[in-house]
Design a protein with these regions (language model features):
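Von Willebrand factor
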Residues: 1-59, 62-106, 109-111, 124-132, ...
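Extracytoplasmic/secreted cell-surface and envelope-processing proteins
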Residues: 15-16, 110-115
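A short acidic, amphipathic alpha-helical/loop segment
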Residues: 21, 114-117
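Conserved beta-strand scaffold positions in the cores of enzyme catalytic domains, especially
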Residues: 44, 121-123, 141-143
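Short, structured coil segments at secondary-structure junctions
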Residues: 117-119, 137
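Short, charged, surface-exposed secondary-structure boundary motifs
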Residues: 131-139
């Protein structure tokens, strides 16, 4: 079973519409993989300056339900480090055994961890921003673009 963590920046600068867009974009990417939800365990984590909420999704139905029911928790400042600490603890408890990647949707204005973990990380932005320069060089920076 492969595992993926999707973290969503729920600080005051990210709207519910933006959070739902992040989830929609992720679903589009993941659903293109053959039998994705039959082989994956996906953590969806909301974080502003601390972990506000998380859910583990194992199926397409659970994903759709989560997208419909999601409420934004947080709205404070942004600190990316609690998600990395959450992952470390889940790995220590053996709840995460085969983590492939962390995808972190954000506007980029926050505190980044200093050390690279043992899994791939991508910080995903809706548009290019000055904050992208703060992303550590060991992480990917992706821009999904704005819809018109």
């Amino acid at each position: 079973l492969e595992e993926l963590v999707i973290a969503i920046d729920t600080s005051g600068s990210c709207s519910k519409e933006l959070v739902q867009r992040f989830l929609g974009e992720t679903y589009q990417i993941l659903s293109t993989r053959e039998n994705f939800f039959k082989k994956m365990k996906v953590y969806i984590v909301q974080c502003d300056c601390c972990i506000q909420w998380y859910r583990i999704v194992h199926s397409e139905e659970e994903w759709r339900s989560c997208m419909q029911e999601i409420t934004i928790q947080g709205r404070g400042g942004t600190d990316f480090r609690p998600v990395f600490e959450f992952i470390r603890k889940e790995k220590a408890k053996r709840k995460l055994r085969n983590l492939k990647a962390l995808i972190y949707f954000t506007d980029g204005d926050g505190i980044y961890p200093r050390e690279k973990p043992d899994y791939e990380i991508a910080f995903v932005f809706v548009k290019k921003t000055e904050n992208m320069r703060f992303v550590p060089n060991w992480a990917y920076k992706l821009v999904i673009g704005e819809r018109t």
